[in-house]
Structure formats: structure tokens, C-alpha cells
Amino acid sequence: MNLKISKPLLLSLAIFVGAGQLTGCGTTTTKKGEVGVERKQILLVSEEQMVASSEKAYSNVIGEAEKERKLNTNAKLTQRVRLIANRLIPQTAVFRADAPRWNWEVNVLESDQLNAWCMPGGKIAFYTGIIEKLNLTDAEIAAIMGHEMAHALREHGRERASQQVLQNTGLNILGAATGMGQVGMDLTALAMQVTLTLPNSRTHETESDRIGVELAARGGYDPYAAITLWQKMDKATQGGKTPELLSTHPSHGTRIQDLQKYAKKVYPLYLSAKKRYR
């Protein structure tokens, strides 16, 4: 039996779904850790779908970089970044028991951009520009690494993909009501989009800052390096175009105040952890 739904009802559903009114679906992807991040999230795309799509998208990015001879061109720098990642990855268990077993990948791409990112499931890319132009210390690289890992741990990409699904569902319902057809959804393209194109919200950025300093501290890196990092970023962006990494982040002043508070909170973790890496 075909259920017939009136156009006014379809339009109401489109508005309801498009507005994201599904608060009953909230879940928390991570444990609180010392920094206490525990916001509930709406996740409509399955974790398995998101990770599989991200793996494919990451493979495309790496394949293109390899073709253009821009992949891991500096062996020493690549090793340096991977060693830092290897110290931080075990610390992810504090927030998610499954995370250390993810299929983590870390690569360095030849690019002048001040950027780095981590796709769902632990697919990381650092651009040479951010390390070389800012003359980053290991602790400052760890601050960026922890921040980007935190996006994956909190599944911010999956959360943003879910928001896109909500919007597209609303459009499809609207299309059914108006006869305009449906909007397709390519999850691989979406995984690429939510990592490289769509901006994170300031909430996402603040969560990642806080979790990031804890990951760095637990890995034996001074969490206060996150502050010197953003001071360097501030200096690098004065009078110029805002780097992709900073395009939607909180203001430098707000961020530094928050980082000072949370770096102080996790500093004892750093003092304990650094003994293991002498």
C-alpha cells in the first residue's frame, strides 16, 4: 500500500528536518578526560560508513600528491612528524578505548599552506608550510597534532556530515513536495568536504583545543607550546590572508586565554609523562 502524504505535511517535514530538530538522538563520542569535554552530538551517518569513505578520500589525496611528487619529499621531516604521532596515538585511549587500534596514517605534503588535518578514522596530513614557515618545535607540532586528532576522536567530521544529511533530507522531502527531484549524497566526496572544505564550528575548535593539549601533555610535550604556536600564527597572519587552519577558529585572544587555562590543568600530566621520554 502506498502512503500518500499531503504537500503541506511534506513541507512541514522538510522544515523540521532541515532545521535539525532531532535532539533525542544525542550521544557522546568520547570520555571526558581531564579537560571535561562531554557535549552530546547528533550522529546520523554510521561510523563505519564515515571511516570507509574517509579512507577512500585520503587515498585519493595521497595518490594525487604522490603523482605530483609532493608526498613525503623530506624524509627527515616525515620521520619527525610520525614520531610525534606515535607518542600521541596511545594517549587517545583516555578519550576512546578503540582509538589506539584505528588504522592511523601520517603523511607530510609539500605545500606552502599553513595547514594540517585529520580525517575520520585517523588519516593525518601535515603541510610542509606550517612546519617550515613557523619554525615549529616538536611540542608545537604536537599541539597541532593533538588538535587535529581530537577532531577525529570527537567525530566532528561525522557530526558535520550528519548535518549535511539532515539538510539534504530536508531538501529531498521538499523536492517530493514540489516535484523538484532528489539531492544525491556521495559519502566519499562528503568525507573530503567535511575535512578540507566545510568549516568546523567554534564549538568543535574549542573542544579540539582542549583535548589536544591533554593529548600533547600525556605524550610528554609541554602543553603551553599550544600558546606559543598560536602566537606564531597570529604574527604570521597579520596583514595577510587567514590560513585555512584558522579560518573558523576563535579569535587569537579568546583562544589563548582558554589554552592557558587548560594547559595549566593538564601540566601535571606533562610533568609525569616527560620522565618516560628522557
What kind of feature is each model-predicted range?
Residues 2-12, 17, 21-278:
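A Zn2+-metalloprotease active-site environment signal
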